[in-house]
Amino acid sequence: MVAIRMISVLLLGLTVSGCASIETATRNAPLDVGGLEAPAVAVDVRDIRVSVPETLRVSEANAYLPAGDIVWRGDPPGNRHDQVKAIFEEALQRGTATMTPGHLPVVVEVEVARFHALTEKARYTVGGMHGLHFVMQLRHAETGALVGKPELIKANLRGFGGQAAIEADRIGQTQKVRITDHLANVIRQELSGPDGYVAANLRLGGLSGQL
């Protein structure tokens, strides 16, 4: 059982993100999906379920901004859907593992919507942004009822380029390490306060954004 501390379970928001050289995570208008309107309560995470739909398109093109929903080079060539799922599972387990359990038993369901990391071409030249999008929904662990509404979270992370990327790799801060740590922090904040994870509203720079 994974424990988390007090949170506000008013799950609102819908956002999109793209590729640029900033770090950000935002939430927007609520999805029009039914569910229990939950008050601020302490929750107890009983399970974490991650899905990466097969409909998400994988790109292996070595371009600055390749088309596709999944762009990932931080693991050896293989099933990118499975690799992305493993990253999210590790991040969510780590992000909730140290939190204190509350009174409402829940399952955290996450569906990946976009996982757009940097290609070799971008990483070793100008850098950019890792576009990390996922839909999160809480469900009552015993009744299966929805708790609050699902939200699409944009949890983007600035990706190093050029010499900075080389130095990051040298000290063990690979794309995989940084993205996993970042997602763990995002989910911890999302499940720890009434406003969830909200990053600074920074100007875009470097590569242009891509929806």
Show the residue positions of the predicted features:
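Bacterial N-terminal signal peptides that target proteins for export
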Residues: 1-8
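C-terminal motif of bacterial Sec signal peptides marking the signal peptidase cleavage site
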Residues: 15-18
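A structural "domain/chain start" motif
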Residues: 20-81, 196-211
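C-terminal/domain-edge helix-coil "capping" segments
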Residues: 20-26, 163-211
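Extracytoplasmic/periplasmic, Sec-exported soluble proteins
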Residues: 40, 76, 80-84, 88, ...
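Short secondary-structure boundary motifs at beta->alpha junctions and helix caps
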Residues: 63-65, 69-78, 147-189
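Mid-chain, structured segments of secreted extracytoplasmic proteins
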Residues: 79-103, 110
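Surface-exposed short loop/turn segments
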Residues: 98-147, 159-160, 169
